[in-house]
Amino acid sequence: NDKLKTILEIAESDGKGFEPTSFCSACLIRKPPRSKHCGTCDQCVGKFDHHCPWVGNDIGYNNHRIFMLFLLLILCIMILNLYGGIMFYKLSCNVASEDSLWNSILVFNSCSSWVLWMILNALFHVFWVTILTTIQIYQIVFIGMTTNERINRGRYKHFIELDGKSPFHFGP
């Protein structure tokens, strides 16, 4: 058992070389750098970014790339939804180009309220997923931090020593 082995090693070394910040008191294991214990999932996650209630899982070392791909695919799908809805209205509804936005929306609603709902829903999701994707790309590429590290950088020794900059950043 890894937990028992870790505890025995610490006990037998009389605490020499024991670094409390690299030990998870919940899992009773030595944590790798950049890992964090997620209270929701009750597990330590390497290169922990955040717990995502949307996917019901922690985002970290093993799945961050897949999560980014997931966000990009959602953006593509929502943009296709918008395009399809707009094309439906162009081909199926009599909307004059000189109509105001409000009149166009009323015509869209009378033509197909379901498609109007899909367009509004897609717009909402494009908005927040674009913000989330942009923040994730900024953190990964430009500052070399996870969301957890960016939020808690004042609590981590390796960030405090570098005035809040990431020692893991090797990008542009």
Regions flagged by a language model, labelled:
Residues N1-H51, V55-P172:
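Membrane-associated feature with strongest affinity for ZDHHC
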